[in-house]
């Protein structure tokens, strides 16, 4: 930022995933707000191991760094031995014949992984990208996913559509030499209500079921 301040921020209980607390507590525009700050870094881990690693890096990183965490207890995906460089990502189930890429971060990574399992049962090969570094985003991994899948991407985020993960993905690919983009951007639309986390993810259209439907539709488009 202009002041060249070194500020580390952690935002918890964000997104419809928080459940019963309701929309006044969901902070569905936090990623957009911090992404807009010049030179900022925005991180969104999906499990405890990734969170621990990124917190350590925050302490050693100058500038304005924001880390968004989730409220619920989610399965641990990564070992503590894994590294999570700022500006990186993790690819799950990637292969040379993938038909679609599912991009998520935080809670929606778990939904993307569940969706990939269901798509595999339907005969559709899907890679999953954990975009834990929302800013800077891993542009090269996105470009490679486009090259393999014919630019079929489903981006799912627990955030309003403006300025969050979907915007970061599209901005990264806007000037890239990739096939014509076929992107399904699943994000929270309108004002959520109060309920169980799974109910609210489903109502917002960002659950694994919606990700599967979006991916299947993209795979029908030639």
Task: Put a short name on every predicted segment.
Residues 1-101, 110:
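Conserved thiamine diphosphate
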Residues 18-19, 68-222:
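Thiamine diphosphate
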């Amino acid at each position: 930022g202009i002041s060249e301040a070194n500020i580390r921020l952690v935002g918890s209980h964000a997104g419809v995933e928080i459940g019963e607390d309701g929309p006044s507590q969901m902070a569905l525009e936090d990623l957009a707000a911090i992404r807009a700050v010049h030179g900022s870094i925005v991180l969104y881990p999906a499990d405890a191991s990734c969170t621990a690693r990124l917190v350590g890096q925050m302490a050693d990183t100058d500038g304005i760094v924001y880390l968004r965490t989730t409220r619920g207890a989610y399965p641990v995906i990564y070992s503590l031995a894994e590294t999570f460089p700022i500006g990186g990502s993790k690819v799950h189930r990637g292969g040379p014949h993938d038909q679609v890429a599912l991009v998520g971060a935080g809670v929606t990574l778990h939904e993307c992984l569940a969706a990939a399992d269901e798509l595999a049962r339907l005969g559709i090969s899907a890679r999953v990208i954990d975009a834990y570094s929302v800013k800077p985003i891993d542009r090269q991994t996105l470009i490679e996913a486009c090259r393999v899948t014919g630019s079929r991407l489903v981006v799912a985020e627990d955030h309003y559509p403006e300025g969050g993960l979907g915007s970061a993905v599209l901005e990264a690919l806007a000037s890239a030499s990739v096939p014509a983009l076929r992107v399904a951007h699943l994000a929270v639309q309108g004002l959520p209500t109060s309920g169980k986390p799974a109910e609210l993810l489903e109502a917002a259209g960002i659950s694994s079921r919606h990700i599967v439907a979006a991916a299947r539709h993209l795979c029908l488009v030639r």
